Amino acid sequence: MKIDILSIFPDMFSGVTGNSIIKKAIENERVEVEVTDFREYAEGKHHIVDDYPYGGGAGMLLKAQPIFDAVQAVKEKQPETKPRVILMDPAGKRFDQKMAEEFAEEEHLVFICGHYEGYDERIREHLVTDEVSIGDYILTGGEIGAMIVMDSVIRLLPGVLGNKDSAVTDSFSTGLLEHPHYTRPADFRGMKVPDILLSGNHAWIEEWRDKESLKRTYERRPDLLKNYPLTDKQKTWLKEWSDSK
């Protein structure tokens, strides 16, 4: 996969691409990440990327020209692909695990990170394929949002995680929150690991994990159960918890 990031603050991404899982993914050639300062594509002596909005109003808007030309330039480097051009914007579709899995199937992603009051509307109308938000709040720019999406997508790529099952069993990947985890020691200052996890009976352990996953979802994110295909056993557990309230 190739990921292009367009930002007027490219140095913000060095910490993400130079550490941990993403660094290893780049070193192992599972993904190529290139960060471009789209200010370099702005016309004129001073390379200005923003201007006042027509009709008045507060703040400055990112101009269409630098971003259009920067996107065209990164597309020309990968002429064999048809990239998803992703605009990070609070008005976009809420990012979730399903979207991460969808993006992970692509060959080429281009992230546009904005600043100031917003974008010239022609960028939305004629350039981007996706508008993505990481939540109902405002940040100073799109860079942090792009980092979140990029991290979530890269860890899903084949060969990136050491254990191929890690991404499959994560919270949200199964539709439920993940079950509790424990490691050694079995007794830490009187706080003990559930006996069933020490039993060695894999069938019991799997059932315990399934039940705890469902219980955690029921208690913390009941909205996720609305369209979840429950088994008969899971329905019985839910009824027990509901009746005990």
UniProtKB/Swiss-Prot annotation:
CDD domains recorded: TrmD-like
A molecular function GO annotation: tRNA (guanine(37)-N1)-methyltransferase activity
This protein's name: tRNA (guanine-N(1)-)-methyltransferase
Lineage: Bacteria, Bacillati, Bacillota, Bacilli, Bacillales
Transmembrane in keyword set: no
Catalytic reaction equation(s): guanosine(37) in tRNA + S-adenosyl-L-methionine = N(1)-methylguanosine(37) in tRNA + S-adenosyl-L-homocysteine + H(+)
Entries under InterPro entries matching the protein: Alpha/beta_knot_MTases, tRNA_m1G_MeTrfase_C_sf, tRNA_m1G_MeTrfase_TrmD, tRNA_m1G_MTases_N, tRNA_MeTrfase_TRMD/TRM10
Record flagged with keyword Zinc: no
Cellular localization per UniProt: Cytoplasm
GO biological process: tRNA N1-guanine methylation
Enzyme Commission identifier(s): 2.1.1.228
Pfam families tied to this protein: tRNA_m1G_MT
Native species: Listeria welshimeri serovar 6b (strain ATCC 35897 / DSM 20650 / CCUG 15529 / CIP 8149 / NCTC 11857 / SLCC 5334 / V8)
Main location: cytoplasm
Binding site for S-adenosyl-L-methionine: G114, I134, G135, D136, Y137, I138, L139
